[in-house]
Amino acid sequence: MKKTRCIFPALTLLFLVCPVGAEAADEEQVRPNIILLMGDDHGWEEVGYNGHPYVKTPYLDEMAASGLRLDNFYAQPVCSPTRGNVLTGRHPNRYGTFTPGRSIRPEEVTVAHLLSDAGYATGHFGKWHVGPVKKTSPTNPGAMGFDEWLSHDNFFELDPVLSRNGGPPQKFYGESSEILIDEAINYIEKKKQADAPFFTVIWFGSPHEPYSGIETDLLLYQDLPEKYNDVTVRLTSNETGEKVKRPLRDVLIERYAEITAMDRSIGKLRNALKTLGLSDNTLLWYCGDNGIPPSGLRESRFRGYKGQLYENGIRVPGVIEWPAGIPEPRVSSVNAITSDILPTVCQLAGAATPDVPLDGINLMPLLNGKMNERVEPIKFWYFRGDQKAEKSAKPYIAPELQTGTTPLVKKMGGLLTRNFKNFHHPEIREQDFVGARAILTDDYKLVIEGEKGMGVELFDLKKDPGEQNNLASAHPEIVKRLSKQLRDWQGGVMNSLMGRDYTSSTSLKSATESDVSDGKAKPF
C-alpha cells in the first residue's frame, strides 16, 4: 500500500512541465528514464579510469569517458546508511539507520514513492539491506515505493537466493551481477512495451566479501604481484560463513574478478538500452555504497577504509551517463554525495520532494555545466547507537516483522539470515552527539574522532588528499566555525530521530528551478 501524501504540489508541477493537449504527450516523453546502479564496497580507486593498475572496468571507463565523471563523489562509510541516504535524500541517523542491519522507518518518503506519484514505473533489483524483503515487512521495497522487486535482505555471491515481490526465496544460478542485469532488462523491455517511463534501481552484491568469481574472470588476475602473498587478511569463508585468514593476493584476485563481472553486466545493460532505442534519454548513475574494506585494501593514495570517515571510507566512484542531457564528456571536482540523488532525480522527473529536512541538494546545475562549487557543506556522522540504552528501548517495528528470509553466505550473529532493528529515541542527550563525524567544504575537511583518540583533525584535501597533515592547530578559527556548523546540524538530525519530521500525512514540496538554480539547499 502506498503512503498517504499530499500530492497537490506534485500535480501542479506536472501541469507546469506537461502542457495540456497534443504537446503534453511529447513533453511527457522528454522526461528521462532513470537507472541507479550501485556497487557493494566498491572504492574510488577500484576503476580503470581512476588509474588502478590492475582492475579491469572497460564499461565504467566508457561511461566516464562519455558522460559526467564525478571525481569527488561521496557515500556514507557503510552499507545500510548509504542505501537509506539514496532512498530518502536524508542522513540515515535521522531515521535510525545508524549501521548495517538497522532498518529504515516506514514513515520515510523515498525517491521511489515520489517518482511513482509522478507516473514512473519503479523496480528494484538486488541488495536491499534497509529492512527485510518479505511481504509482511513494512519496509520492504514495495512498501517503500517500488512496484516490482527481485531483492535480497543483505548480500549474496554466485547462485544468489532472491525474493520476487516478497515471495518465497528462489535460487538463481550463475554470476549474481549478470542475473540482476538480465532481470532488469526484462523489466525494462516490459515497460517500453507499456510506453511507461521507468525508474530502475540495481544494487549489486559485488564486490562485497566473501569473494568469489567465475573462472574466466579469475584468470584475468593471475598475474597479480606475488608480494601480496606476504600479507594476510581476515574475512568471511565462502564455505562456512565464518571468519578465516587468507593471503591478500588470493583475496584480491576474487575481489577484482567480481568487479570485472559487475562491470561487464553494466556493459550488457548499456548495449540493451541501445538495442531498445532507449539509451539516448536514459540516465545511468553509477556509484559505490562505501569505500574499500580492510580485506580488499592494497597500497592506496588515501587514508582509512570502510567504516571510517577518512577518504578511503567514504569516497567512491561516481559517474553519470545521459546522452540527451550530457552530450559532451565532462569531469567535475565539485563535492557531491549519495543524498544528492533524490533531489536531482526528482527535478529530472518533474516530481515533488518531501517537506522534511533534506541533506542532499539538487545537482541539475552541475549536470547542466553551471555549478563550479558546492555552497552547502557535506556533513558525515557515523553514530553506532547507544547499545546499552537500546536494551530497554522500545522497538520501532515489531521484531517479528524485522526477521530476514533470504539466506546469506556470511553468518551474522551466528545466523545465516539478516535480522533488522530500529528503536524509538525518546529524548536528546549529550552522549548522543558522539561518534566519528566530519564536515566537508570546498576548502577544508574537519574530522572529529575519525579514529579512537585522534581528536580534531583539519585537512586541505586539494593539497593533501591523503589526509596526512593535520592543520587544526594552525587554523583554530576554522576549526571553531566548522565544529559549530557540525554540532548545529547534529541537533537537527536528533530532532528528526525523535520523529518530529513525521505527521499523519507527509506533505510534498514542489521542486522548481527557483529552488535549485544556484545549487544551494533551500529551507522549507
Report the location of each language-model feature.
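Bacterial N-terminal signal peptides that target proteins for export
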Residues: 1-10
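Short hydrophobic transmembrane-like helices used for membrane targeting/insertion
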Residues: 7, 17-20
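Formylglycine-dependent sulfatase
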Residues: 12-15, 22-450, 454-457, 465-485, ...
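Carbohydrate-binding/catalytic loop surfaces
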Residues: 508-510
